[in-house]
Amino acid sequence: MVFSSQTFLFFFLPLAGLCVFVRSKPLQNALLLMASLLFYAWGEPKMVALMALVTLVAYLSGFAMVHFEERPGAKKVVLVAAIFVIIGNLFVFKYLNFLCRTLSFLGLEDPHLALPIGISFYSFQVLSYVIDLYRGRIGLQRNFFYLLMYVSFFPQLIAGPIVRYETVEKEIRTRNVTMDDLTTGFRRFVVGLAKKLLLANQVAQVATIVYAGDPKYYGSLMYWLAAIAYTLQIYFDFSGYSDMAIGLGRMFGFHFLENFNYPYISFSVTEFWRRWHISLSTWFRDYVYIPLGGNRVSRGKWIRNILIVWGLTGLWHGADWNFLAWGLSYGLILLVEKLWLGKYLERLPKPLRWLLCMMVVCVGWVMFNLTDFTQMRFALVRMFNFTHVPLVRSLAADVSIVPPLLWMVPALIFSTPISQGIRLGDSWWAEVVRNMACLALFAICILFSVSASFNPFIYFRF
């Protein structure tokens, strides 16, 4: 079920929203759990049991670690076993197909296992629970259904943000939903919905048309526009989902951490990754990079740590060579930036630093988007070989590209924090204006959703 679908907006959300008015927290949690499992079962009925099984592994491992609190060795064995099972499950369903295809020369056949939606996200949440419990950062959750609600809670289940248990530990047991939570959460949800329907979906066709079209009609300019369009599409698609998840969570009394902070205003690749998919970046930092030694090791080991983290980051996004290449490329760029290039970049004017950073990001998204290496190589070469094709000829090749190109203008504007400059204050009339604007935007989104074809979020694939 997609947040932007008619089914979700007019059937599921109103019914699930009734949970807010249930005063008993145990009953409210039970209803939210049932709603979340229904939400997941809507598209993946067979995979609900798999998610519950992974949660059960974490639940039982938690009790075992508490039992062995005075025996560190046994406690660590339990942790390692739990991690092995959780990652093993992720590997089988996400990477086994890829491994068998890669090693097909050994006679291995592709098992064609279906990828459970959201498995990368909920696996990382379960891992954070068992690791943080081992570290003593959180308390044991003795109620299996509460733990399952944390893992399966429908706002963030499919595409994040990756919510750590410590963020919602208290709110699972005790939370109060105020009118401010409902209005603020709904407004945030509508902003995310608008990002998806009014911006991401509209600019998406630029890259689709160019990459699927005859190259003789598209020169370097159009290939750059395609790269920029996909850069905008993936930002508004993914940050839109995060906004909707954060807004929905707020409406039910949960406060999720931010996942994006205007990444396209960054002046360096390092800054970009502090602003993009924050929940994933900090997850790898806290559970992989720092345990490997972080930057408090020799230079050689530090370089190793960076490459391991970014190789895993690439593979987390997808089981294909282009994702691994994308992740390792960013690892190498960050190494060059930290070891040498950074001090020179700081001497450049800010507009030039921003332009260079965005060029790197756009190239990165081309690698991310195109899984076929031949097509990827052609697109990257065409971007930099100054092939000239008159713009009129490119537009005439497929005139349906014109509206998406025009939609790129507002998308570029709203990828910056320009809206943050609008300050209405806290008076009653300002609140009325905000709510009226929100309802108007919601109505526009509904009109777009009625005519839109099925267009799932990009990160549903991961």
What do the PLM-derived regions correspond to, one by one?
Residues 1-461:
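Membrane-embedded transmembrane alpha-helical bundles that form the catalytic cores
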